[in-house]
């Protein structure tokens, strides 16, 4: 027996020596923007959801988390780019002022990042399936030569909730003013005219003076009425023909201008322009706080951010979100410019040309786009403590628990951590000014953005989202250098458009000269 055991032990040891060591997971370097300096980068290494994604992909991450204010992080990003030594994966706002001059298109032209088409085909089944099932989304993620250059959080914008989660502004009114003049919130252009007239003549602020501003058009408020005339501000798609048009170069624009000029002439709109060049006026806030503005372009957080200060002037003040006015041709309710299908101007994730293991980098990112990966970057993991005790997973994903007494979200370690640390929102618990998104590549799961909001915030976003976005021009943000030059030339006409729009609305130029305006645009 002893001899047998000794022999068996010896054989076992020999087999162990002969067997190859278990392969270690490949490691990729991941460069990401964090929050301000107070947010500890080590959290990226400790969050359970991100650990789970690495486990799913069989890939480890060596993090570089850049923290600080705008100037500080821009300096670090520029220094990294100038060094010529690039991390494997770079997650950043590459296409805006904090990013690379020329955006990801120029990064590709300069040899900094790789094209992803073959990478997606070979190593990213989750992501490839999403693109195949959502061809319209896929188009917006390509450059104008059909290349995929970056990854980004994607909202498919199909369900009402998905639309509402990125719809945070629209038309708003003083609810108490509507009650004071005995009217309901308007739903058509004609009803808007009637309500604005009542605001002007009915002394709804109750100070016995005709000082009301029925519609404060600050921050481009009048542009929100363009979809009611079947056009948008800039490029749009005609839903009936499928052809691309330009809002300010159309006969529908003349009808829009006629209505806006009428409102302006009758004193129903004010604070439209800052100067005679057609520069749009600043926000409606001063007139709002002075108890003078009856309607305006507002954000869904105005109940929290603006109403308390208005109540200091008028304790009876209250706001109400107003739906987009129905199209004048009777085709329904439409709008655009609120939730676009362009993603490149947000945080985008690229794979650099210095990446020695593109397959590992691709597997990691693809795991984030899986259903489980999306849950990980949104909720954490079902079995992680304390999430399991604080969140409901009966629907296959996490859901915040709302305290019935306060109506507030029940705080969890995960929620506080991910919100405080991840740049560009992650959880919108502390990111108060707009609904936001997780910056990591991910798909859908828009429901989390609604779970932490005040009831009126959610209700207004849902109301504004109840409209067709068929006018939306799904242009890809990423353009090659030649295309960028062409767009720049097109943009040169904007000064003329702004100047003439100012003149038409204010009456400085009669609308009988609209055909001349159209001819001049054609020449330009």
Label each PLM-derived region with a short phrase.
Residues 24-29, 57-62, 83-88, 110-114, ...:
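Loop/turn elements at helix/coil->beta-strand transitions in domains of secreted/extracellular proteins
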Residues 111-140, 195-200, 208-236, 289, ...:
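Carboxylate/His-rich catalytic cores and anion/metal-binding grooves
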Residues 4-22:
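Sec-dependent N-terminal signal peptides of Gram-positive bacterial secreted proteins and lipoproteins
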Residues 367, 371-502, 508:
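Conserved small-residue motifs centered on glycine
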Residues 114-133, 176, 184, 234-251, ...:
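Short, solvent-exposed loop/beta-turn-alpha elements that line the ligand-binding surface or hinge
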Residues 21-191, 229, 234-236, 244-248, ...:
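Conserved N-terminal structural module of periplasmic/extracytoplasmic solute-binding proteins
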Residues 117, 145-148, 152-221, 238-287, ...:
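Helix-loop-helix "hinge/cap" segment bordering the ligand-binding cleft or interdomain interface
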Residues 34-49, 157-172, 179-185, 218-269, ...:
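Extracytoplasmic/periplasmic substrate-binding proteins
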């Amino acid at each position: 027996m002893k001899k047998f055991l000794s022999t068996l032990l010896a054989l076992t040891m020999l087999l162990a020596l002969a067997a190859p060591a278990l392969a270690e997971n490949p490691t990729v370097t991941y460069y990401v923007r964090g929050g301000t300096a107070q947010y500890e980068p080590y959290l990226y290494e400790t969050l359970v959801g991100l650990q789970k994604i690495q486990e799913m992909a069989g890939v480890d991450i060596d993090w570089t988390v850049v923290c600080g204010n705008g100037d500080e992080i821009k300096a670090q990003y520029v220094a990294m780019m100038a060094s010529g030594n690039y991390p494997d994966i770079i997650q950043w706002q590459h296409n805006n002022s904090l990013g690379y001059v020329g955006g990801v298109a120029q990064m590709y032209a300069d040899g900094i990042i790789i094209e992803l088409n073959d990478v997606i085909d070979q190593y990213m089944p989750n992501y490839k399936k999403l693109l195949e099932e959502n061809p319209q989304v896929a188009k917006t993620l390509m450059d104008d030569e059909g290349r995929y250059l970056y990854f980004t959080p994607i909202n498919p914008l199909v369900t009402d909730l998905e639309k509402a989660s990125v719809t945070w502004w629209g038309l708003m009114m003083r609810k108490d003013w509507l009650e004071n003049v005995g009217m309901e919130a308007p739903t058509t252009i004609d009803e808007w005219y009637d309500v604005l007239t009542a605001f002007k003549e009915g002394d709804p602020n109750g100070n016995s003076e005709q000082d009301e501003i029925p519609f404060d058009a600050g921050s481009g408020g009048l542009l929100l009425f363009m979809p009611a005339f079947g056009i948008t501000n800039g490029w749009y798609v005609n839903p009936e023909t499928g052809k691309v048009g330009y809002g300010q170069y159309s006969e529908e624009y003349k009808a829009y201008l006629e209505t806006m000029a009428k409102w302006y002439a009758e004193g129903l709109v004010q604070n439209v322009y800052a100067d005679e060049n057609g520069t749009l006026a600043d926000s409606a806030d001063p007139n709002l706080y002075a108890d003078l503005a009856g309607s305006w372009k507002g954000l869904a957080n105005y109940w929290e951010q603006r109403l308390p200060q208005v109540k200091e002037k008028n304790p009876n003040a209250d706001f109400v979100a107003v739906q987009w006015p129905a199209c004048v041709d009777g085709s329904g309710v439409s709008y655009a410019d609120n939730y676009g299908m362009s993603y490149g101007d947000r945080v985008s994730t690229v794979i650099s040309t210095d990446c020695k293991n593109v397959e590992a980098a691709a597997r990691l990112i693809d795991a984030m786009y899986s259903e489980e990966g999306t849950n990980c970057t949104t909720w954490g993991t079902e079995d992680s403590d304390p999430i399991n005790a604080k969140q409901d997973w009966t629907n296959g994903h996490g859901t915040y628990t709302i305290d019935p007494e306060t109506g507030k979200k029940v705080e969890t370690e995960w929620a506080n951590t991910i919100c405080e640390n991840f740049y560009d929102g992650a959880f919108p618990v502390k990111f108060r000014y707009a609904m936001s998104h997780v910056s990591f590549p991910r798909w859908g799961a828009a429901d989390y953005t609604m779970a932490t909001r005040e009831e009126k915030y959610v209700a207004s976003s849902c109301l504004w989202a109840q409209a067709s976005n068929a006018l939306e021009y799904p242009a890809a943000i990423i353009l090659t250098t030649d295309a960028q030059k062409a767009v720049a030339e097109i943009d040169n006409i904007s000064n003329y458009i702004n100047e003439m729009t100012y003149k038409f609305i204010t009456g400085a130029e009669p609308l009988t000269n609209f055909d001349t305006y159209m001819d001049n645009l054609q020449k330009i």
